[in-house]
Design a protein with these regions (language model features):
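Extended, low-polarity transmembrane helix blocks
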Residues: 1-28, 32, 44-56, 62-162, ...
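Short juxtamembrane and helix-loop transition motifs at transmembrane-helix boundaries
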Residues: 28-41, 163-176
Length: 263
């Protein structure tokens, strides 16, 4: 299972890098990272700084260059931008903030922050972390990584029941019973998120959650990316990479549980 964890760490970073990469091309924040705050100055500059920081953290994790520190800083960055960016925007600015769908874009960033903390928890301890107040604080957030990730999974599962028609339209035409699979997928996300949060048969439930998202990657997200690679600032490609990061997060949780390491 250690091999699964190591491979999944790399996969998480590839997915996250694939999500932020298009931002440099479009000089705009992706739908999942920062909302359209009115009158925000120097947007291309902030986009560049954020993207470079995320890519640098991903490279450090993949090549094990102060990897735990990089993962902690990555998780802290994503969580801070979610709280002060998307969460605040959705709470005070968004017109339809009483609809769960309004919060859906930002929830991906929350899940990615949780994934970064899961990655940090899967890496060996780093003595340099104890020398920094910020890193010591971020290290205390590691146990909340699975909760952040699973909260998004549960809420996305609920979206399958609230927005059945548009979500069922994502099911490929060659698969019969679109409505059934929409409800099934929503139920599976809710069940997976709850069981992983409660650590019920954690190695099995987290693995099945990751496997389900991986299957969706191949039968839903990749075909959509091929059909419309550049629409809405390459949103289909970004969604495919987010699915890659999400399944990697679930596999890391599963691998750590199987190795009887704290998650």
């Amino acid at each position: 299972m250690d091999k699964l964890v190591k491979l999944s760490r790399i996969t998480f970073c590839i997915g996250l890098a694939g999500m932020v990469g298009p931002q440099l091309f479009y000089s705009a924040f992706g739908n999942n990272f920062f909302p359209a705050w009115p009158h925000l100055p120097l947007v291309p500059v902030w986009v560049c700084l954020f993207t470079v920081a995320v890519l640098a953290a991903c490279i450090a994790i993949v090549f094990r260059i102060k990897a735990r520190t990089a993962a902690l800083l990555l998780g802290g960055l994503l969580l801070a931008i979610y709280i002060f960016g998307y969460f605040t925007y959705d709470l005070f600015v968004a017109q339809y903030n009483n609809h769960l769908g309004t919060w859906a874009d930002g929830l991906k960033e929350s899940a990615l922050a949780g994934g970064a903390f899961v990655v940090a928890g899967s890496l060996p301890a780093d003595s340099s972390v104890q020398k920094s107040v910020v890193l010591r604080f971020l290290q205390k957030l590691i146990p909340f990584g699975p909760f952040l990730f699973c909260t998004t999974m549960v809420l996305y599962g609920i979206c399958h029941f609230l927005y059945t028609q548009p979500i069922s339209g994502l099911v490929p035409a060659w698969i019969p019973g679109h409505m059934f699979w929409t409800y099934f997928g929503g139920s599976a996300l809710i069940l997976g998120g709850v069981t992983v949060t409660l650590k019920i048969k954690l190695n099995i439930t987290a693995f099945l959650l990751g496997l389900m998202i991986l299957i969706w990657l191949f039968i839903i997200h990749i075909p959509l990316s091929v059909n419309d690679p550049f629409g809405n600032n390459s949103n289909s490609i970004v969604s495919a990479f987010s699915a890659l990061s999400f399944c990697a997060t679930a596999f890391i949780i599963s691998g750590m549980a199987a190795s009887e390491r704290p998650v």
